[in-house]
Amino acid sequence: MSRIQAPATSRMQSIARNPAVIALFMTLALAGCASKKNLPNSAGELGLNNATPGSQQDFTVNVGDRIFFDTDSSSIRADAAATLDRQAQWLQKYPNYAITVEGHADERGTREYNLALGERRANAAKNFLVSIGVPADRIRTVSYGKERPVALGSNEAAWAQNRRAVSVVVQ
């Protein structure tokens, strides 16, 4: 039995020492660790489109209830503007509803700094919605800073998910 295993073991060792095999393995390992910037903005993008029209679930699933921000920024990105446009259309279609825009930040920075950043993010979303026709009195803002993370972890993937503004439908 040892004669049968010995050639296979020696063949595996020679393959493992081959620089091309090592380079291929490292490339595959690094590609598996690459992060995707195109995170879904809504549950609808995940294929969860069965919601009652005019409900919070409809808003979340079919419109998108959250937008994301770059690090230390409250500027509305192009992908966020598209989501806010859909939110404005939904609010025009359902005039009996209002929203609360919750501003959030990742874990980096002080509590006070992140509360202020969350407030700037919530206000940026509100101001954008108002600029495209949503009455200001239908939009309330609140900042939670870093106090309500949706993703735990001290890495870029978690931080990216926590740099957000979430619109919650209220009646």
Label for each model-derived stretch:
Residues 6-7, 40, 56, 89, ...:
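Helix-termini ("caps") and immediately adjacent flexible loops/tails
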Residues 34-98:
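Periplasmic peptidoglycan-binding/tethering modules of Gram-negative envelope proteins
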Residues 29-32:
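C-terminal motif of bacterial Sec signal peptides marking the signal peptidase cleavage site
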Residues 2-22:
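Bacterial N-terminal signal peptides that target proteins for export
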Residues 104-170:
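Periplasmic OmpA-like peptidoglycan-binding domain that tethers envelope proteins to the cell wall
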